Each structure stands twice: as structure tokens, then as C-alpha cells.
From Swiss-Prot:
Family that this chain belongs to: Belongs to the CD99 family.
Bias (Basic and acidic residues) ranges: 96-120
Subcellular location: Cell membrane; Cell junction
Function, in words: May function as a homophilic adhesion molecule.
Major place of residence: membrane
Keyword Signal: yes
Species of provenance: Danio rerio
This protein's UniProt keywords: Cell adhesion, Cell junction, Cell membrane, Membrane, Signal, Transmembrane, Transmembrane helix
Transmembrane segments: 178-198
Annotated protein name in UniProt: CD99 antigen-like protein 2
Amino acid sequence: MEKTLWTWTLLAVFSLLVVKGMSDGLDLADALGDDDDDEPTTKPPKADPGAGGAGGAAVKPTLKPVKPTVKEPAKPKPKQTGLDDFDLADALNPDNDIKGKGKDSGKGDKEVGGGSRDDGTPNSRGSQFSDDDLLDVGNDNSYKPDKGKGGKGGSSSNVGDLDPADDNNYDTMAETGTIAGIVSAVAMALVGAVSSYISYQKKKLCFSIQQSLNADMVKADAPDAVVAQEPQVQQTLLQPPNAEPPTEENAV
């Protein structure tokens, strides 16, 4: 029984020692990896067997020049940028523009904002638009619009390209517009005169009807007085405005 106990005790001690020895070299950080422990991407150049040395083989003479083999250094990996490194100002940097391919790839990329014309004259910066840009466009004689298309206007440089028939058309259109304006003014005046005359006749007719009604009412109320006053009223109407009013002796 004692031997069995000693045996188990020795096994337990031995297992503890083994576990302790294994745990000394165990590190959880090894599972996460480290950039410093990565192997270098560039391999050391191999030794040239033709180089001079005790164990090197002899180089055979050749007529062709031997080009040295030089390996380009490995390009560093681009650093991954997060949202904290995002900056809108990078869009205004001309170095970040994507260049096109071909001989005309750099044409038009003048200053920030690009937009250079085909004549090679660079425009001003996109945020500094000035009057010089408009003057350059006005002095550009390379643009010639197609005949019969677009507007008829043009700068002084294109005056010789105009058709004489166009000037006649302009004069005809101007005369037509003037005549139309005069005719419309006369028509409006006639319409106003006719409407005024009609309104005057309506008022005159209304007054005459009112006077006749008043006279009929007076005759119906006092026929004797009306008969006595009618000659005086007729005489008053026949007299001029400067005449003296009739007296009682002259009244009939």
C-alpha cells in the first residue's frame, strides 16, 4: 500500500514539473502575431559564383557585356486609412487626380479645377474666377459656328460671315413691328371713341326720358298752372343768356 502511495506521489510531482516547464515557454501573445516577427520580404542577393574567391569557379570570357542584376526594392504596402484620416481637402490637391492615358492625358489639367481650353491657355484656379477668363473667351477667334444654326448674333470678328439677306430680314421685321404697333394704337383709339359716344347717347336718352316724365307728372297735378306757365317757359328758352328776366307786366 505504501509503495502505491509513493508511486502516485512521484507521478504527481513529475507531472507538475513537466507542466511547469512547458508553461515557461508558453505565451498567448504568440497567437496574435507581431509585425516585428515577420520575415523580411526582400531576400538577400545570392552570391555570384563568378565572383573572385577561393572557392569560386573561373569566369569564361565573353564578348557581350555582362549586365549587373539589381533587384528593385520592394514597395512598401500602402497604409490603411480609417475614417479619422479622411479629409475633403485632399480632393483639391492636383497630385491626387487620376491621370488619363495617352499623349493628351495631361492636356487640360492646368492648375486646380482643370478646364483648360484646347489652345493651351490655362484658366485661372477654380476658386479664383476673374474677368480675364471672359476676355480670353471673347478674343478667341477659333470658334466659328455653322451657318443657319443657332442665333444670328456674333462678335465683331464674325461680322464678315453674315449674309446680306439677314440684314434685309432684320429691317423687314423691324418695319412690320412698327406698323403693327401703329395699327393697334389706332384701333384702341377708335374703340375708346365709339364706347364714349355710346355712353353719351345713353345718358342723353335717360335725361330726356326723365324730363318728359317730370312734365307729365306736373301736368297731371295742376293742368291750369302748366297752361299759364308754358308761354313764359318758351319765352325764357328763346331769350339769350344775357337778357333780363321778364317782369310781371310783360308776362302774358
